[in-house]
């Protein structure tokens, strides 16, 4: 099997030998934030997704190590099977196939990571590589005129901000478990800033929940004061930062913490940019009456992409859970939600097991916390549309955790 030499992330003066699947895993995980969709040119994102999925499948077959299965992965596989069944009764099979491709990628990422990764050096190389690419993207987005030199290379801001949730948690974990305290703390803070500067409420909420989950993993019930403090900081940010407050409410004048405490602020005051109306319309038309099975995989996406709805020119419903309900019903939502519930619970159990080494604990807390944050963002955005940059990262960390556990058990 082909081998390559890379710098050891634990000692930059040393070199490490990796086999072909390990090198391809590092490359795949490090470059998920690259979109290659230059404006005015051929959109390569869907093609790249298909190619990556084929390569992951090939990697599973050529790697001498076995993929690791868990209740989370099995549940997710059943969910994919249910999506395929949904093609049999959908009026939009073409869009259904595209939806399946997007949901299939996290599954393949979990399986391929659990197969390729057996050493902590490979895990750190992949994670640090992904963080370097994310740092470069921040420079491209925020340094004046630099973005013009790289049009369409990175995913746009919405997807990137959700990707930064995983990188923020990864940096925080390295702060706790490595000697480079100052560097990793600064990077953790840096990855929090874009969603605030861009005023992306979805990513702000996702980052907040990811941090709360991280501290709960680490300190359990002792973390409640810290979790409460993080939540208070989120509330303060909503009301104290003018740009966030202006985007949050239809009329931000007179909106403050005092009004929140007195009950003067209701859901009617929140500016959802039409999301609430879209969700209600979608559920009324495609979910109610077909609660168990929905109306078929890809149906809602086809309706929005073809503008067969009263909310033109909007082309997505901005809620993955509403789309699951409309396309695949309660069965689909239970299977998808159950898989990630098992994932987070498994990560929590692994993190509390003191027999495992630091690398496994680090992987577990990053996977569990970033999964919680990313799942929350799916409530107000179609995160699966950018699955290479978003949902695949918690799943990738989870897959690497399974691979490291397999090495630990073998030893």
What are these regions (language model features)?
Residues 266-284, 288-328:
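Long extracytoplasmic/lumenal interhelical loops at the membrane interface
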Residues 132, 328-372:
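Hydrophobic transmembrane alpha-helices and their immediate junctions
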Residues 43-60, 100-109, 160-170, 204-212, ...:
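Membrane-embedded alpha-helical segments of multi-pass membrane proteins
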Residues 52-55, 342, 364-411:
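Transmembrane alpha-helices of multi-pass inner-membrane enzymes
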Residues 53, 108, 121-149, 154-219, ...:
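Alpha-helical transmembrane segments of multi-pass inner-membrane proteins
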Residues 197, 218-265, 280-288, 297:
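A membrane-periplasm/extracellular boundary helix in multi-pass inner-membrane enzymes
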Residues 72-82, 93-116, 134, 138, ...:
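Aromatic-anchored transmembrane helix interface
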Residues 1-85, 91, 95, 115-128, ...:
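Transmembrane signal-anchor hairpin modules in multi-pass inner-membrane enzymes, especially those
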């Amino acid at each position: 099997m082909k081998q390559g030499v890379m710098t050891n992330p634990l000692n930059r003066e040393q070199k490490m030998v990796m086999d072909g699947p390990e090198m391809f895993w590092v490359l795949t995980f490090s470059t998920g934030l690259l979109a290659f969709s230059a404006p005015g040119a051929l959109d390569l994102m869907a093609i790249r997704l298909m190619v990556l999925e084929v390569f992951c499948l090939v990697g599973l077959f050529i790697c001498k190590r076995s993929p690791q299965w868990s209740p989370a992965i099995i549940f997710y596989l059943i969910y994919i099977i249910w999506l395929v069944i949904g093609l049999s009764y959908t009026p939009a099979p073409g869009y259904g196939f595209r939806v399946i491709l997007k949901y299939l990628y996290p599954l393949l990422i979990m399986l391929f990571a659990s197969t390729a990764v057996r050493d902590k050096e490979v895990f750190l190389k992949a994670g640090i590589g992904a963080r370097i690419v994310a740092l470069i993207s921040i420079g491209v987005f925020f340094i004046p005129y630099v973005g013009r030199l790289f049009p369409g290379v990175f995913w746009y801001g919405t997807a990137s901000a959700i990707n930064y949730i995983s990188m923020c948690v990864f940096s925080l974990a390295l702060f706790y478990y490595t000697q480079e305290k100052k560097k990793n703390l600064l990077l953790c803070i840096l990855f929090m800033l874009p969603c605030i500067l861009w005023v992306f409420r979805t990513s702000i909420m996702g980052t907040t929940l990811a941090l709360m989950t991280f501290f709960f993993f680490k300190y359990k019930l002792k973390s409640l004061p810290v979790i409460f403090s993080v939540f208070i900081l989120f509330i303060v940010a909503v009301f104290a930062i003018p740009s966030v407050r202006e985007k949050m409410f239809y009329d931000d004048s007179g909106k403050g913490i005092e009004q929140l405490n007195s009950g003067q602020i209701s859901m009617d005051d929140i500016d959802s940019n039409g999301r609430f109306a879209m969700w209600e319309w979608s559920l009324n038309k495609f979910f109610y009456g077909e609660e168990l099975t929905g109306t078929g995989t890809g149906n809602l996406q086809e309706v929005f992409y073809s503008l067969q709805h009263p909310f033109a020119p909007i082309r997505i419903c901005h809620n993955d859970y509403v789309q699951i309900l409309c396309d695949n019903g309660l069965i689909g939502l239970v299977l998808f939600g159950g898989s990630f519930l098992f994932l987070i619970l498994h990560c929590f159990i692994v993190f509390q097991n003191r027999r495992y080494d630091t690398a496994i604990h680090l992987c577990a807390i990053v996977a569990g916390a970033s999964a919680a944050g990313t799942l929350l963002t799916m409530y107000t955005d179609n995160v699966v549309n950018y699955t290479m940059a978003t949902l695949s990262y918690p799943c990738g960390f989870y897959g690497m955790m399974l691979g490291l556990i397999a090495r630990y058990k073998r030893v």
